[in-house]
Amino acid sequence: METFLFTSESVNEGHPDKLCDQISDAVLDACLAQDPDSKVACETCSKTNMVMVFGEITTKANVDYEKIVRDTCRAIGFVSDDVGLDADNCKVLVNIEQQSPDIAQGVHGHFTKRPEEIGAGDQGHMFGYATDETPEYMPLSHVLATKLGARLTEVRKNGTCPWLRPDGKTQVTVEYYNENGAMVPVRVHTVLISTQHDETVTNDEIAADLKEHVIKPVIPEKYLDEKTIFHLNPSGRFVIGGPHGDAGLTGRKIIIDTYGGWGAHGGGAFSGKDPTKVDRSGAYIVRQAAKSIVANGLARRCLVQVSYAIGVPEPLSVFVDSYGTGQIPDKEILNIVKENFDFRPGMITINLDLKRGGNGRFLKTAGYGHFGRDDPDFTWEIVKPLKWEKPQS
């Protein structure tokens, strides 16, 4: 059996780039909660003792940007300079302007267009991916890397590993077998965790705690063997972290947000964007399409692409690739996709209920992945029943 290795990485919520994603989406939530028609393009950057939010927002909502920044930082665990940022005492800079009137007239006609007439907020192409290798219809390498990061945060916040600090990264290499285009995980080849820690703990204690409290509960035993390699804080020291260690910026973790390097990516980030931005809404609808194809048994693995022109409602193209795993030809799968999914931005917004913010709905997406999550707020994860006839063998 010929196998190959594939690696996916993740970062947890205290990573400076992810901090910025979460602040941008917390701003989006706050705007949509009061004004579902808010037009939001909110970026965040951070460095030592400073967070800045900037971008274009047109909203009737009354939003306290500084409070959102401080609350988000505090919830993650950035409560002192020692851990990388002090939520209550850091500088918060705000530079928010209205959406460009040129964009507004072209996309939504200054709020006058009906949903089916709303154009794409920009050009671009987005990809959705699904695979039958996990119950989430997501790649195992990505699922494990993401869950390790989430578990790191869990054991930090519940006191199991009190020496942990907010920043951290994970990476998992999986050995795979290609079964006629479908991906079959064989074993976990390598587990890498680099986590921020306080001064009190030794490297041996870090490694022991990570194996016992993070790796064991996350990675199924069947994937681990005596040959599995563990790199646990391989650099030896990671005390300085968060924005103190590295500058953070919204939209720099787009592969972590999606499929861990599997499938393809059009390059557009998600966080801080309202649903007229097809970088986000387009990527969500093609995930639903790809997942529905696999969950309905049409294929074991699937990639769906959609593309747009600014101001134009209808997509320019839709593409399907089943990697040779389709029960019927890809051309027929494409027809089923077009019959069952409306790719116009205004209709995606309605069908996936994307104007509903608040209660941390989009904030949740900004940590630990936008896809493969079992949460009713992740409406794009709902599998649509697709009618098709299996060919007679």
UniProtKB/Swiss-Prot annotation:
Q: Which amino acid positions bind ATP, per UniProt?
A: H15, D167, G168, K169, S235, G236, R237, F238, D246, R252, K253, A269, K273, K277
Residues that bind K(+): E43
Note how many cofactor molecules are bound and how. Answer: Binds 2 divalent ions per subunit. The metal ions interact primarily with the substrate. Can utilize magnesium, manganese or cobalt (in vitro). Binds 1 potassium ion per subunit. The potassium ion interacts primarily with the substrate.
Which PROSITE patterns does the record cross-reference, listed alphabetically?
Answer: ADOMET_SYNTHASE_1, ADOMET_SYNTHASE_2
Coiled coil location: none
Check the record and name the InterPro entries matching this protein.
ADOMET_SYNTHASE_CS, S-AdoMet_synt_C, S-AdoMet_synt_central, S-AdoMet_synt_N, S-AdoMet_synthetase, S-AdoMet_synthetase_sfam
Q: Which Pfam families match?
A: S-AdoMet_synt_C, S-AdoMet_synt_M, S-AdoMet_synt_N
Signal peptide from the UniProt entry: none
Reactions performed catalytically: L-methionine + ATP + H2O = S-adenosyl-L-methionine + phosphate + diphosphate
Q: Which cofactor does it need?
A: Mn(2+); Mg(2+); Co(2+); K(+)
Q: In which pathway does it act?
A: Amino-acid biosynthesis; S-adenosyl-L-methionine biosynthesis; S-adenosyl-L-methionine from L-methionine: step 1/1
Family indicated by similarity: Belongs to the AdoMet synthase family.
**Under what name is this protein listed?**
S-adenosylmethionine synthase 1
Organism field: Elaeagnus umbellata (Autumn olive)
**Annotated gene:** SAMS1
